[in-house]
Amino acid sequence: MVDVRKLIEYNEEVRHRYFDSLAKLPWDELTKNREASFHSLRNIFIHTLGAVDYWLDFLLNEKLRTKREFDDYGTMDDLQKYMARVEVRMRTYAASLTPEGVLKEYEVTNDLGVATRVTAEDVLIHVFEEEVHHRGELIALLWQMGIEPPLMGWKYL
């Protein structure tokens, strides 16, 4: 059985590979509207960080997530700082999780408008898969640009 914290660590490791690849692109290529879910490579990357930030607020009953818009991130340094802030929050939360904490229940309204009971583990798995889905989108866009995406397989498989 995989510990959800291992999935979080994996996502962080792979996220850095993608950040490094995106950092090599000219800014106009990074921000170009490619008619994808959040239009540009930059926006998709920011969205995945925003999802982590949002769900950490939910799990921790905080209101610390950024209110910045995509265009407020004008440099790779801006992206790196946001990524670092979100990752510190996630690492701190994950390190504090006890076996009981992973099973803590919350009520959330799902995308169908239905109130649903979920555990912290459910939320963390959702955060993991949300980023993986959008990583697939980044892969497709990089391929369309003729760029080989970074390795992303679990344990380099």
Predicted feature locations:
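Basic/polar N-terminal segments that are highly enriched at the extreme N-terminus
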Residues: M1-R5
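A non-catalytic, amphipathic alpha-helix used as a structural packing/dimerization or gating element
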Residues: K6-R17, K81-R85, R89
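Short, contiguous alpha-helical
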Residues: I8-D20, K24-D71, D111-L157
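Helix-adjacent hinge/juxtasegments
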Residues: E62-V102
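A mid-sequence interfacial segment
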Residues: M90-I125
